[in-house]
Regions:
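Long, contiguous binding/interaction regions
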Residues: 2-39, 55-80, 85-87, 95-135, ...
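Acidic, glycine-enriched active-site microenvironments
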Residues: 91
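N-terminal interaction modules that seed assembly of large macromolecular complexes
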Residues: 36-51
Length: 182
């Protein structure tokens, strides 16, 4: 079964907790993340069947009201993305290292999904605004050409929306840098 991913971002932590509760009660979805992020925002990320995620998002948005900053629905999310949000993907040997930084939390998730669908890479992490002053970043690994293609695909998507901060491909990262990231 192909899963959908839904995400909402709010500027109120109490309202975010309430919206997350409403999202979970509205439909049979799986909670990926429900947490406070920088700077004083709150995110809720769920996965499930498309109709369930749509119902869940609708309920969350209704509760969030004017506190809603952004929302996202990806109907056919790659399985690596939800795990990367929680930094729990099995990485194995790290080849080339790629990183993208965004100004938007929702667009980081979209960029990660685009990158992993564009090339044969493994997502290491999709860090959503925790300790980053409201930014997000995506790390990935694979062979050099694949990481370059993934970064290019994700970056082009971000540039259209004007929310890409920076990106890099490191063909042979130092083992201590790899250890710090995985």
């Amino acid at each position: 079964m192909n899963k959908a991913l839904g995400m909402i971002e709010m500027i109120s932590i109490p309202k975010g907790i309430e919206a997350g509760d409403a999202m979970m009660k509205a439909a049979a979805v799986e909670l990926v993340s429900s947490q406070a992020v920088c700077a004083g925002k709150y995110i809720v990320v769920v996965v499930g069947e498309v109709s369930a995620v749509e119902a869940s998002l609708k309920a969350g948005k209704a509760v969030a009201e004017m506190k809603l900053v952004d929302s996202l629905m990806i109907p056919n999310i790659d399985d690596q993305v939800p795990c990367a949000i929680n930094a729990c993907n099995e990485i194995g040997k790290v080849g080339a290292l790629g990183a993208m930084e965004t100004f938007s939390l929702c667009t980081a998730v979209l960029a990660a999904d685009t990158a992993v669908k564009a090339a044969e890479i493994r997502l290491i992490e999709v860090r959503l605004g925790r300790g980053l002053g409201g930014k997000s970043f995506i790390t990935m690994t694979g062979d050099v050409a694949a990481v370059e293609a993934a970064i290019s695909a994700g970056s082009k998507l971000e540039e259209v929306q004007g929310l890409m901060s920076d990106s890099v491909v490191i063909p042979a990262p130092h083992p201590e840098i790899v250890k710090a990231l995985v």
